[in-house]
Amino acid sequence: MARDPDCLFCKIVAGDVPAELVHESATTVAFRDLQPQAPTHVLVIPRSHYANAADLAAGEPETAIHLFDAARAIAESEGLGEGYRMVFNTGPAANQTVFHAHLHVLGGRSMGWPPG
């Protein structure tokens, strides 16, 4: 399992940095965003370090699927049956600020379009 010793999310996976965990599996970890953009805002990450979603899909396609499985389970447990949004920001121009692949799960309010 690849890790980057300087990566904040790798440190969360290792338990070196605290986070409010809401879901864990053999390949994923999910925790609440510290700056939520919706009443429910959870980040789902692979335990392995990949800089973005494209790299994750190329390197561990099964783990990429596991992120979506985790997102569904989180949405159910958070009571988001009316709907929720899943977002990957990939690269600086897309406002990715932590370069460890992560899936945003947002819900608990009506979501407008376009998002940004």
Regions inferred by a protein language model and the residue ranges of each:
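HIT superfamily nucleotide-processing domains
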Residues: 1-116
